[in-house]
Amino acid sequence: MLFEIWVDADSVPKGLRTIILRAAARLGLSCSFVADRSLPDVVQYIADDTFALRQKARGEGVSDPEAIKAVRSRIRMVVVQSGSDSADDHIVQSAKPKSLCITHDIPLASRLLEKGCFVIDDRGSEYTSDDIRARLGDRLVNRELRSWGVFAEQQGRMDASNQKSFADNFDRMLTRLGRMQEAN
């Protein structure tokens, strides 16, 4: 599998980041977590993954110190400047068509879909070109209602069933993208 994963890490809860980290490491995928601050859980996972990969290389007979040093995790933490949409802009500029992107941010999802990326939210639901306009419209209506003091229904807290749903849908998406890539 050679496609990339891009994570809007500001909008993805820690429990879901762990699911993404484990899958990316297991499959050897390039995975970038983008946020306006460093996320300790991601940084630690990258260090642990790099250590495990270097141990594996040593076990396979690689002994040259420079060759060992070159072995690194394909997961990275990208810290962008604080500011409105700075992480979003970085993801849009960096993601290639057919990348898998994970975000809860509907305008970002729309921009990524226009670029030809696959996008899922923090519940594992896939954003599509067919439904993104409706989601953007709902977002505008909810924003207007909030400005009037009327609070629209919000998603509930992330719980174990939400995490399982995300994990299942994320795995299905990885399988689907892997098959698409193999077919090309």
Locate each region found by the language model.
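Nuclease catalytic cores that cleave nucleic-acid phosphodiester bonds
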Residues: 1-184
